[in-house]
UniProtKB/Swiss-Prot annotation:
<dbReference type="GO" id="GO:0010628">
    <property type="term" value="P:positive regulation of gene expression"/>
</dbReference>
<dbReference type="GO" id="GO:0055059">
    <property type="term" value="P:asymmetric neuroblast division"/>
</dbReference>
<dbReference type="GO" id="GO:0014016">
    <property type="term" value="P:neuroblast differentiation"/>
</dbReference>
<feature type="compositionally biased region" description="Low complexity">
    <location>
        <begin position="274"/>
        <end position="292"/>
    </location>
</feature>
<dbReference type="GO" id="GO:0060385">
    <property type="term" value="P:axonogenesis involved in innervation"/>
</dbReference>
<dbReference type="GO" id="GO:0003700">
    <property type="term" value="F:DNA-binding transcription factor activity"/>
</dbReference>
<feature type="compositionally biased region" description="Low complexity">
    <location>
        <begin position="92"/>
        <end position="109"/>
    </location>
</feature>
<dbReference type="InterPro" id="IPR023082">
    <property type="entry name" value="Homeo_prospero_dom"/>
</dbReference>
<dbReference type="GO" id="GO:0002052">
    <property type="term" value="P:positive regulation of neuroblast proliferation"/>
</dbReference>
<feature type="compositionally biased region" description="Polar residues">
    <location>
        <begin position="1208"/>
        <end position="1217"/>
    </location>
</feature>
<dbReference type="GO" id="GO:0005938">
    <property type="term" value="C:cell cortex"/>
</dbReference>
<dbReference type="GO" id="GO:0007409">
    <property type="term" value="P:axonogenesis"/>
</dbReference>
<dbReference type="InterPro" id="IPR037131">
    <property type="entry name" value="Homeo_prospero_dom_sf"/>
</dbReference>
<feature type="domain" description="Prospero-type homeo">
    <location>
        <begin position="1545"/>
        <end position="1603"/>
    </location>
</feature>
<feature type="region of interest" description="Disordered">
    <location>
        <begin position="23"/>
        <end position="292"/>
    </location>
</feature>
<dbReference type="GO" id="GO:0000981">
    <property type="term" value="F:DNA-binding transcription factor activity, RNA polymerase II-specific"/>
</dbReference>
<feature type="compositionally biased region" description="Polar residues">
    <location>
        <begin position="1349"/>
        <end position="1367"/>
    </location>
</feature>
C-alpha cells in the first residue's frame, strides 16, 4: 500500500515522503525517471520515509531541510511529477527520506525496512505494479517502526486491537515483505516501502503524527508513544511534518510540496505544508487518542485537515489530503491516499485489519470526535474546500486556493489537534466504539472527506499519477483518478493490498503507459494528468496489491487478529455487518474484519482482490469503519475500493472484489456475494456501481454523518455501517463479481474478475469514448472543478454538507472517472496490458475529459443559471429536499443494497440515485449545493423536483442500470451527457456549488435578517425583561425587607423566649444582616446599573432571606425545643445583649435596605426625570439639530448635501432622515426613553395608542432611565455635535441634486416595501423601523449600536453615529436614520427619504417640524406636550406631537419664526411634513397620495414612511389619531384628490412652475415631500421630483443673486450696518423678487417673506462687509440661516387647481 501511497507521496509529496518530496523537488530533473523510476524511488522513498517517519518522529527538522526544496517543488509540480517524484524518491528520499524516517521514529525499523524493502524490491520487480502492496506492508512497517520506536504508540495505533505491537511486528514483517514487494518493483518499491512505512508511520503514528506535529507543537511524548504507531504514523508524521514541522515541517512541507507539486503542481506544495501542519496539530492530538488511527486521522486532518477529513479515516484522511494534495501534490494525495489508507491502515497498518478498521474508525472517530459534529462539518467544509482547491489546483486553480483551503485545513487541524488531544485519550475507545459510531460523526466529516477522498482519490490519485509530470488541471483531474488510486492505495494501506492491487494495476498500467500518458497528457494536461495519475495509481495499486498481498499475508493474520479485536470492539456493527451485508455500517467493519481476516486469503490469492479486501479490511475495516464512521472512510474505502476498482479495473476490481469479497464474506451470509458475483460480467459497471454506491454511500454516509441515523439501523455507526454495508454490498456486488472470481478462484478470480472487469471497462471505456457522458465524467470533474472554483469564488459555500455533496459529487465523478478509467486500465492492464489499458484509458479519459469538460462547461453554465434561478426555490425546497433526501437516502441505501444484490448496475443506479439523494440531502444541508445536485439530476427541475427526481431517478436508474448495467450504468441516471459511472451527485456538483454559493448568499441574507429580527426581538425582550427585572427586584427588595422585618420580629420574640436562641439568632441575624447588607449594598451599586443587574442580587438576597427564614425558623424551633435549658442558661444580660445586637443589626440592615430602596427609587426617579429632561432637551436639541441640519443640509452646504444624501443612503438617512424622517421615525429619532418605549412596544409608541405609548414610554423611561443618562450624556455630546451630527450622519456626500435629496412618498413606500416597512398599516412597516429604533434604543441601553447597524441597516452611520444618536441622538433623533437608510437607499438612490434636508429641514424644523418633533416628541414627552396642539393637528403622534408641531419643541429650540408657522402649517405640516417625512404620513397628504399619487404607494409610503419616519407613530396616528386629522385632511385632500386624481399626471406644467414660484415666498428649501404634498395632482417620480427641486434651486439662485447684488450695492453705497438695510413693499429688491416669483401678483406676498429677504440681504451684507465673500463657500452659512426661515405653505397651495382658483 505504501508503494501506491509512496508513489502518490512522491507524486504528491505525501507526508510520508515529504522529505522525499523535498528531495524530489530537488530532483525535478529526474523527471525522466518518471513513473518506473518513481516507483523504485518510491520504494526508496518509502524506506527513507519509514526512516524519515522515524526520523520525523525523532527529527522534524529534516523536513525543513526538505522545505528548502519547497521552491523546487513548484517547478516540479509543473514539471514532470514522475521525475520529480522519482528524483525525490531516488535521491532526496533516500537522503532526506531516511533522515525523515529517522525522524519518524522508524529508526529501529529502518534496517528491517530496508531489508524488507530489498525484499520488496524483489517482489516489486515481480509486482512493481503492486507497489500498493508494499505500501500496505509499509504501513505495517510503519507500525513496526513505530513499534520499534515506541510500543505505546504502536499500541495506540493498534488501538483497535492490542495487536498493535503485533501489528507493528507483523507490520514489520509485512513491511519487510512489503518493502521487498516494493523492492521487487525495484528501488521504487523499496523506496515506496520506505515511503509507505514512513507514510504509514506518519499516518498510523498518531504519536508520530503527534510527534511530527505534536512533537513540535504538541509533545515529543506523543511522538515517542506514537513513534511505534508511527510507521503509519510516520505517514501522518510526515503529514504533520509538512504542516507542523518547525524544522520537520519545512522538510515535510517541501516534501509534501514536492510531491504535491509534482502531482498537483505547485499548488499543493504551499497548501500541503499548511495542510501538513494542520495534520501535525490534529495528529498530535489524534495520535495519542487514536493510536495512529486517530493520530492519522487527526494528523491527516491537521496535515490535510481537509484532506484527512476528506479521507474520513483511511479514505477520510486520505481524501482531504487527496483534496489538498490532490490539488497540489502527490505528497498530499499520496499521504492522502496512503495516509488515508495509512490513516485507515495506519491503524490498520498497526494491525492491517483491525488497525485499518480502527485507523479508519479512529480517523472517523478522530474526525467526528476530534472535531465534533460541528468540527467535523467544519473539517468537511475545509476538506471540501481543500478538495475543491485540490481539484481546482489540479485543474490549474491558483495555489492560493489550495493554500487557503490548506490554511483552513490547518486551522481546522489546529482545532482538530485540540480535539485530538482529548481524542488521544479516547481514541482507542473511539477507534473501537467510533469505528462505527464515531464513524457516524466522522461520516459527516469523512463524508465530505470520503467525498473528497472519492473525489480526491481519482483526483489525488490521478494527481498522484499525473503529479509526476502533470499540470494543475491534469493534476486535479488526475488528482481525481489519482485520488482514487490513492484512495485505493489508502484502501490498500488501510485494508491491505486490495486497494494496492487496484493501485498496482493502475500503477502497472500507468507505469508502462505513464510515459505515453505523459505525451498525451502534454497535449491535454488535464486529461494527461488525470490519466497519468490513474495509470500510475493503477501501477501503484497493482504493485501495492502484489506487495500488499505479501504484506497482507503477513499482515492478514495481524489484521485478522486486530480486526477481530476491532470487530469485537465494533462487534455490534461488525457482527451486524457480517450478518447483514445490507447494513453496510455493520457489515463494513466486520466485513472489513472478516474480509481482512477471511478474505485476506482471497485477497492474497488475487493480488488486486487481496489488495481490495485489505483495503476493505483497512478501507472497509478502516475505510468502511471510516465509511460507516465517516462516510468517507467507508466511502474512502469504497471509493478507494470502488475508485481503485474503477481506477485500475484490476486494482479496482480486486479492491472492489476484495471489498465485495469482504463484504460478500460478510455479506456472503446475506447472499450478496452470490448476487454480487452474479453480475460479474458487469463488474465494471458494478464497480462503477460500487463506486457510485460508494459515492452515494459516501454521500449517504456523509448524509448519515449529518443524519447518520437516517437509516439508523442500530446506531449512528450502525446507520453508517449499514450505509457502509450497503457500500460493501455495492462493493460486494462489484466486488462480488471479483469476489466470485476471487472467491471462486482466488487466484483465478483476478483474471476472471479482470475479464469481467475488462469487459466492463471496455464497455465503460467504449461508453466513455463513444458517449459524451464519459467526457462528461471527466467534464463532470472539470465541471466540478469549475464548480469548485465557483465555490472558491463563493467561499461562503463552506457548509460541510455542501462540501460533502460537492466533494462527494466531485469524488464520485472523479472516482467514477478514474475508477472507470482504472477499471479499464486495470482490466486492460491485467488482461491486455497496463500500457494498452493505459492507452485506452488515456484515450478515453482524454476524449471523455474533453467531452466532459466541454459538455460540463455548457451544463455548468446552464446549471449555474438554473441554480441562480433556483436559489430561492432551493431555499424553499431545501427542507422538502432534505426530507425527501432522507427518505430517498434510506431508499437508495436499501435499494442500493438490494440492487447491489440484484445487480451491479442497480447498485450503481441505486448509488447513483443515492448520491444525488445524498447530494440533495447534502445540498439541503448545503443550501447552495442542494439545488445543484438536483439540478444535475434534472437541470430544469426545482430542488423539490430534483429530490423527487432523485427518488424517481433512483428507480429509473436502477431499472436502466439493471437493463444496461454493463454499458452505461450511470448514463440514464442524471445527465445522459455525464459518464456512465458519473454519479448523479457529481452531475449536480457544478449546480450544487453554484446553488450552494447562491443559496449561501441567500441563506446568509436570511440569516442576517433573522439575526436582525432576533436581535430586535432580543432587545425588546431584554427591555421587557429589564422592566420585569426591575419590578421583580423592587418586589424582591420589598419582600426582602418584609422578610427581614419578619425575621427580625421572630428573632426578637425568640430572643425573649430563648436566650441561647438569641445567640444563635444573633449569629443568624448577623448572617442575615450580612446577606442583607450584601443585598442592599449590591442593590445600591446596582441602582446605578440596569435593573437586570440588580435583579439577580436582589433576587439572590430575597432567596437568601427566604432561606434564612427557613433556616432561622428551623433553628428557632430547635432552640425552642431547647427553650427550657436555653432560657434557663441565658441570663438577662445575655438577652439584653442579644436584643441590643439584634436591634443594631436590624437597624443597620433595615436602614441599609431602606437607604438602598430609597436610593434606588430616587435614582430611578432621577433617571426618569433626567430622561424626561433629556427627552425634552433631546427634542429641543433635535429641533436645533434639525434646523442646523436643514441649514447644513442646504443643498449648497456640504452638510445639507450630506444630510440629503444620507436620506438616500442608509448613512445619510441617519441625520437627514433624523431631521426629516426621524420625526416620523420617532422611535429612533425619539429620545432613548421614547425610543425604548417604541422599541419595547415593538409596535412603537407612535404605533401604539397614546396610553400604550405613554405606558411604553414609562416603561422605556424606566428601562432607559439609565439609557437616558447615557443618552443625555450622548445627547450633550450630540448637542455639542448637533451640526456635526448631521454631517456625521450623512457623511459628506454631495447631494447629487435636489432631486436626489427629494424622496417621493411613492419612493418611500417602495423603499418601505422593499424594506418590508411598506405595509399600508403603519404598524407593520413601522415594525422594522421600530425594531431598528428599538435596536437603537437597546443600543442606547445596551450600546448595541452594531446590532442596530446590522439590523437597522444604518450600520454605516449608526454604528459610529448611533452611539451618540442612540443616546444624544435620541434627542437629536439621528437614531431614526437607520430605518430611513433602508427606505431611502431602497427606493431612490438619489431621492432622500428625508426631503432635501436643507430644503426640507427648514420646513421640518418649523412648519414641517413634525419631522424632528416626532423624533424628539417620540422620545421627549415635553416636546410632545409642547406640541399637543400640533398633536391635535397631528393626533397620530403623541410623541409626534412635537414632530407634528415643531413650534412647541421648535418653539423652545427653534426660532419663533419656525414655531409661529407651525400653528398655521400643522395641518399643512402634516400633509406636507407627514407626507414628506412620512411620505403620506400626514393624513391629508396621505389621502392625496392615496387618491392622487400611488394609493398603495402613498398609503404604504405614508404608513411605512410614517412608521419609519414617524417611528411608527404616524401609522398609528393614521390608524388612530391620524384618523381625526385624516378626516380633516382627507376632506381637504379628498377634494384635492378628487380634482387631482383625474389630473394625476407626472408632467409638470407652467402652472406648476408658477405655483412653485409662489411657494417660494414661504419655503426656500422645500423638501421633496413638501413639494409632493403641495403638488398633489402630480404623480411624482424621480424626474419630476428632481425638476421641482431644481425649480426651487433656481428660485434660490435668483434670490441669492439678487441678495448679493443688492448687498454689494449697499456696501458700495456706504451703508454701515446691516440694520440699515430695510426691505419695504416698494423696495427695488422686493419688487424684483415679487416680479420674478409673483409676476401676475396672484397672491399677496407674505410678510414673513419680507423678513426673510431682509435677513438674507443683511447676511449677505455682513458677509461682504466682513470680506467673507472671498472665501470659497461663504454663502453656505447664509443658506443655513435662510433655510431655517422657511414657513409653512398655506394649505390652499395643496389644491391642484390652486392657480385656477387664484385666477
Amino acid at each position: 500500500m505504501m508503494s501506491s501511497e509512496e508513489y502518490e507521496a512522491d507524486c504528491f509529496g505525501l507526508y510520508s515522503d515529504e522529505n522525499n518530496v523535498l528531495l524530489k523537488a530537488n530532483e525535478p530533473e529526474t523527471t525522466a525517471a518518471t513513473k518506473q523510476q518513481h516507483q523504485p524511488q518510491f520504494q526508496q522513498q518509502q524506506q527513507q520515509q519509514q526512516q524519515q517517519q522515524q526520523h520525523h518522529h525523532q527529527h522534524q527538522q529534516p523536513p525543513p531541510s526538505s522545505n528548502g526544496h519547497t521552491s523546487p517543488i513548484p517547478s516540479q509540480v509543473n514539471g514532470d511529477g514522475s521525475a520529480a517524484n522519482c528524483g525525490e524518491s531516488g535521491k532526496t528520499n533516500t537522503n532526506t527520506g531516511s533522515h525523515s524516517h529517522s525522524n519518524s521514529g522508524n529508526t529501529n525499523t529502518d534496517a528491517d525496512k530496508e531489508q524488507e524493502r530489498e525484499k520488496a524490491k524483489e517482489k516489486a520487480n515481480e509486482e512493481e505494479s503492486e507497489d500498493s502492496d508494499d505500501d500496505v506492508v509499509v504501513v505495517l512497517e510503519g507500525c513496526e517502526g513505530n513499534a520499534s520506536s515506541s510500543s505505546s504508540s504502536s499500541n495506540s495505533n493498534s488501538n483497535a486491537s492490542s495487536n498493535n505491537h503485533k501489528a507493528a511486528a507483523t507490520t514489520t514483517t509485512t513491511a519487510t515483505t512489503a518493502n521487498h514487494c516494493n523492492r521487487s518493483g525495484g528501488s521504487s518499491r523499496s523506496h515506496r516501502s520506505a515511503r509507505s512505512s514512513r507514510q504509514i508511520s506518519q499516518s498510523t503514528a498518531v504519536g508520530k503524527t503527534t510527534t511530527c506535529a505534536a512533537k513540535k507543537p504538541t509533545a515529543a511524548q506523543a511522538t515517542t508513544t506514537t513513534a511505534k504507531n508511527s510507521n503509519s504514523n510516520s505517514n501522518v508524521n510526515v503529514n504533520v511534518n509538512v504542516n507542523s514541522n518547525g524544522s520537520g515541517n519545512g522538510n515535510a512541507n517541501s516534501k509534501v510540496n514536492r510531491r504535491s507539486r509534482q502531482r498537483s503542481l505547485s499548488k499543493d506544495i504551499n497548501n500541503q505544508p499548511a495542510s501538513s501542519n494542520s495534520n501535525s496539530n490534529s495528529s498530535n492530538n489524534s495520535s495519542n487518542s487514536n493510536g495512529g488511527a486517530t493520530a492519522t486521522a487527526a494528523g491527516f486532518m491537521s496535515s490535510a485537515a481537509a484532506a484527512a477529513a476528506g479521507a474520513a479515516g483511511g479514505g477520510a484522511l486520505f481524501q482531504p489530503q487527496s483534496v489538498s494534495t490532490a490539488n497540489s501534490s502527490s505528497s498530499n494525495n499520496n499521504n492522502s491516499s496512503t495516509p488515508a489508507a495509512l490513516a485507515t491502515h495506519s491503524p490498520t497498518s498497526n494491525s492491517p485489519v483491525s488497525g485499518a478498521s480502527s485507523a479508519s474508525s479512529l480517523l472517523t472517530a478522530a474526525f467526528g470526535n476530534l472535531f465534533g459534529g460541528s468540527s467535523a462539518k467544519m473539517l468537511n467544509e475545509l476538506f471540501g474546500r481543500q478538495m475543491k482547491q485540490a481539484q481546482d489546483a489540479t485543474s490549474g486553480l491558483p495555489q492560493s486556493l489550495d493554500n487557503a483551503m490548506l490554511a483552513a485545513a490547518m486551522e481546522t487541524a489546529t482545532s482538530a489537534e485540540l480535539l485530538i488531544g482529548s481524542l488521544n485519550s479516547t481514541s482507542k475507545l473511539l477507534q473501537q466504539q467510533h469505528n462505527n459510531n464515531s464513524i457516524a460523526p466522522a461520516n459527516s466529516t469523512p463524508m465530505s472527506n470520503g467525498t473528497n477522498a472519492s473525489i480526491s482519490p481519482g483526483s489525488a490519485h490521478s494527481s498522484s499519477h499525473s503529479h509526476q509530470g502533470v499540470s494543475p488541471k491534469g493534476s486535479r483531474r488526475v488528482s481525481a483518478c489519482s485520488d482514487r488510486s490513492l484512495e485505493a492505495a489508502a484502501a490498500d494501506v488501510a485494508g491491505g493490498s486490495p486497494p494496492r492491487a487496484a493501485s498496482v494495476s493502475s500503477l502497472n498500467g500507468g507505469a508502462s503507459s505513464g510515459e505515453q500518458h505523459q505525451s498525451q497528457l502534454q497535449h491535454d494536461l488535464v486529461a494527461h494528468h488525470m490519466l497519468r495519475n490513474i495509470l500510475q495509481g493503477k501501477k501503484e495499486l497493482m504493485q501495492l496489491d502484489q506487495e500488499l498481498r505479501t504484506a497482507m499475508q503477513q499482515q492478514q493474520q495481524q489484521l485478522q487478529e486486530k480486526e477481530q479485536l476491532h470487530s469485537k470492539l465494533n462487534n455490534n456493527n461488525n457482527n451486524n455487518i457480517a450478518a447483514t451485508a445490507n447494513n453496510n455500517n455493520n457489515t463494513t467493519m466486520e466485513s472489513i474484519n472478516l474480509i481482512d481476516d477471511s478474505e485476506m486469503a482471497d485477497i492474497k490469492i488475487k493480488s488486486e482482490p487481496q489488495t481490495a479486501p485489505q483495503p476493505q479490511q483497512s478501507p472497509h475495516g478502516s475505510s468502511h469503519s471510516s465509511r460507516s464512521g465517516s462516510g468517507s472512510g467507508s466511502h474512502s474505502s469504497m471509493a478507494s475500493d470502488g475508485s481503485l476498482r474503477r481506477k485500475s479495473s484490476d486494482s479496482l476490481d480486486s479492491h472492489g472484489a476484495q471489498d465485495d469479497a469482504q463484504d460478500e464474506e460478510d455479506a456472503a451470509p446475506t447472499g450478496q456475494r452470490s448476487e454480487s458475483r452474479a453480475p460479474e460480467e458487469p463488474q465494471l459497471p458494478t464497480k462503477k456501481e460500487s463506486v457510485d454506491d460508494m459515492l452515494d454511500e459516501v454521500e449517504l454516509l456523509g448524509l448519515h454523518s449529518r443524519g447518520s441515523d437516517m437509516d439508523s439501523l442500530a446506531s449512528p455507526s450502525h446507520s453508517d455501517m449499514m450505509l457502509l454495508d450497503k457500500d460493501d454490498v455495492l462493493d460486494e456486488d462489484d466486488d462480488d463479481d471479483c469476489v466470485e472470481q476471487k472467491t471462486s478462484g482466488s487466484g483465478c478470480l483476478k483474471k476472471p474478475g479482470m475479464d469481467l472487469k475488462r469487459a466492463r471497462v471496455e464497455n465503460i471505456v467504449s461508453g466513455m469514448r463513444c458517449s459524451p457522458s464519459s467526457g462528461l465524467a471527466q467534464a463532470g470533474q472539470l465541471q466540478v472543478n469549475g464548480c469548485k472554483k465557483r465555490k472558491l469564488y463563493q467561499p461562503q459555500q463552506h457548509a460541510m454538507e455542501r462540501y460533502v455533496a460537492a466533494a462527494a459529487g466531485l469524488n464520485f465523478g472523479l472516482n467514477l472517472q478514474s475508477m472507470m478509467l482504472d477499471q479499464e486500465d486495470s482490466e486492460s492492464n491485467e488482461l491486455e496490458s497496463p500500457q494498452i489499458q493505459q492507452k485506452r484509458v488515456e484515450k478515453n479519459a482524454l476524449k471523455s475529459q474533453l467531452r466532459s469538460m466541454q459538455e460540463q462547461l455548457a451544463e455548468m453554465q446552464q446549471k449555474y443559471v438554473q441554480l441562480c434561478s433556483r436559489m430561492e426555490q432551493e431555499s424553499e425546497c431545501q427542507e422538502l429536499d432534505q426530507d425527501q433526501d432522507v427518505e430517498q437516502e434510506q431508499e437508495p441505501d436499501n435499494g442500493s443494497s438490494d440492487h447491489i444484490e440484484l445487480s451491479p448496475s442497480p447498485t450503481l443506479t441505486g448509488d447513483g440515485d443515492v448520491s444525488p439523494n445524498h447530494k440533495e440531502e447534502t445540498g439541503q444541508e448545503r443550501p447552495g449545493s442542494s439545488s445543484p445536485s438536483p439540478s444535475p439530476l434534472k437541470p430544469k427541475t426545482s430542488l423539490g423536483e430534483s429530490s423527487d427526481s432523485g427518488a424517481n431517478m433512483l428507480s429509473q436508474m436502477m431499472s436502466k442500470m439493471m437493463s444496461g448495467k454493463l454499458h452505461n450504468p450511470l448514463v440514464g441516471v442524471g445527465h445522459p451527457a455525464l459518464p456512465q459511472g458519473f454519479p448523479p451527485l457529481l452531475q449536480h456538483m457544478g449546480d450544487m456549488s453554484h446553488a450552494a454559493a447562491m443559496y449561501q448568499q441567500f441563506f446568509f441574507e436570511q440569516e442576517a435578517r433573522m439575526a436582525k429580527e432576533a436581535a430586535e426581538q432580543q432587545q425588546q425582550q431584554q427591555q421587557q425583561q429589564q422592566q420585569q427585572q426591575q419590578q421583580q427586584q423592587q418586589e424582591q427588595q420589598r419582600r426582602f425587607e418584609q422578610e427581614q422585618q419578619e425575621q427580625q420580629r421572630r428573632k426578637e420574640e425568640q430572643q425573649q423566649q430563648i436566650q441561647r436562641q438569641q445567640q444563635h439568632l444573633q449569629q443568624l441575624q448577623q448572617q442575615q444582616m450580612e446577606q442583607q447588607h450584601v443585598a442592599t449594598a449590591a442593590p445600591r451599586p446596582q441602582m446605578h446599573h440596569p435593573a437586570p443587574a440588580r435583579l439577580p442580587t436582589r433576587m439572590g438576597g430575597a432567596a437568601g432571606h427566604t432561606a434564612l427564614k427557613s433556616e432561622l425558623s428551623e433553628k428557632f424551633q430547635m432552640l425552642r425545643a431547647n427553650n427550657n435549658s436555653s432560657m434557663m442558661r441565658m441570663s438577662g444580660t445575655d438577652l439584653e445583649g442579644l436584643a441590643d445586637v439584634l436591634k443594631s443589626e436590624i437597624t443597620t440592615s433595615l436602614s441599609a435596605l431602606v437607604d438602598t430602596i430609597v436610593t434606588r427609587f430616587v435614582h430611578q426617579r432621577r433617571l426618569f426625570s433626567k430622561q424626561a429632561d433629556s427627552v425634552t432637551a433631546a427634542a429641543e436639541q433635535l429641533n436645533k439639530d434639525l434646523l442646523l441640519a436643514s441649514q447644513i443640509l442646504d443643498r449648497k452646504s456640504p452638510r445639507t448635501k450630506v444630510a440629503d444624501r444620507p436620506q438616500n443612503g442608509p448613512t445619510p438617512a441617519t441625520q437627514s432622515a433624523a431631521a426629516m424622517f426621524q420625526a416620523p421615525k420617532t422611535p429612533q429619532g425619539m429620545n432613548p426613553v421614547a425610543a425604548a418605549a417604541l422599541y419595547n412596544s415593538m409596535t412603537g409608541p407612535f404605533c401604539l395608542p397614546p396610553d400604550q405609548q405613554q405606558q411604553q414610554q414609562t416603561a422605556q423611561q424606566q428601562q432607559s432611565a439609565q439609557q437616558q443618562q447615557q443618552s443625555s450624556q450622548q445627547t450633550q455630546q450630540q448637542l455639542e455635535q448637533n451640526e456635526a451630527l448631521s454631517l456625521v450622519v450623512t457623511p459628506k456626500k454631495k447631494r447629487h441634486k435636489v432631486t436626489d435629496t427629494r424622496i417621493t412618498p411613492r419612493t418611500v413606500s417602495r423603499i418601505l416595501a422593499q424594506d418590508g416597512v411598506v405595509p399600508p398599516t403603519g404598524g407593520p412597516p413601522s415594525t422594522p423601523q421600530q425594531q431598528q429604533q428599538q435596536q437603537q434604543q437597546q443600543q442606547q441601553q445596551q450600546q448595541q449600536q452594531q446590532q442596530q447597524a446590522s439590523n437597522g441597516g444604518n450600520s454605516n452611520a449608526t454604528p459610529a453615529q448611533s452611539p451618540t444618536r442612540s443616546s444624544g441622538g435620541a434627542a437629536y433623533h439621528p437614531q431614526p436614520p437607520p430605518p430611513p437608510p433602508p427606505m431611502m437607499p431602497v427606493s431612490l438612490p438619489t431621492s432622500v427619504a428625508i426631503p432635501n434636508p436643507s430644503l426640507h429641514e427648514s420646513k421640518v424644523f418649523s412648519p414641517y417640524s413634525p419631522f424632528f418633533n416626532p423624533h424628539a416628541a417620540a422620545g421627549q414627552a415635553t416636546a410632545a406636550q409642547l406640541h399637543q396642539h400640533h398633536q391635535q393637528h397631528h393626533p397620530h403622534h403623541q410623541s409626534m406631537q412635537l414632530s407634528s408641531s415643531p413650534p412647541g419643541s421648535l418653539g423652545a429650540l427653534m426660532d419663533s419664526r419656525d414655531s409661529p408657522p407651525l400653528p398655521h402649517p400643522p395641518s399643512m405640516l402634516h400633509p406636507a411634513l407627514l407626507a414628506a417625512a412620512h411620505h403620506g404620513g400626514s393624513p391629508d397628504y396621505k389621502t392625496c397620495l392615496r387618491a392622487v399619487m400611488d394609493a398603495q404607494d402613498r398609503q404604504s409610503e405614508c404608513n411605512s414612511a410614517d412608521m419609519q419616519f414617524d417611528g411608527m407613530a404616524p401609522t398609528i396616528s393614521f390608524y388612530k389619531q391620524m384618523q381625526l386629522k385624516t378626516e380633516h385632511q382627507e376632506s381637504l385632500m379628498a377634494k384635492h384628490c378628487e380634482s387631482l386624481t383625474p389630473l394625476h399626471s407626472s408632467t409638470l406644467t407652467p402652472m406648476h412652475l408658477r405655483k412653485a414660484k409662489l411657494m417660494f415666498f414661504w419655503v426656500r428649501y422645500p423638501s421633496s415631500a413638501v413639494l409632493k404634498m403641495y403638488f398633489p395632482d402630480i404623480k411624482f417620480n424621480k424626474n419630476n421630483t428632481a425638476q421641482l427641486v431644481k425649480w426651487f434651486s433656481n428660485f434660490r439662485e435668483f434670490y441669492y443673486i439678487q441678495m448679493e447684488k443688492y448687498a454689494r450695492q449697499a456696501v458700495t453705497e456706504g451703508i454701515k450696518t446691516p440694520d440699515d438695510l430695510l426691505i419695504a413693499g416698494d423696495s427695488e429688491l422686493y419688487r424684483v423678487l415679487n416680479l420674478h416669483y409673483n409676476r401676475n401678483n396672484h397672491i399677496e406676498v407674505p410678510q414673513n417673506f419680507r423678513f426673510v429677504v431682509e435677513s438674507t440681504l443683511r447676511e449677505f451684507f455682513r458677509a461682504i462687509q466682513g470680506g467673507k465673500d472671498t472665501e470659497q463657500s461663504w454663502k453656505k452659512s447664509i443658506y443655513k440661516i435662510i433655510s431655517r426661515m422657511d414657513d409653512p405653505v398655506p394649505e390652499y397651495f395643496k389644491s391642484p387647481n390652486f392657480l385656477e382658483q387664484l385666477e
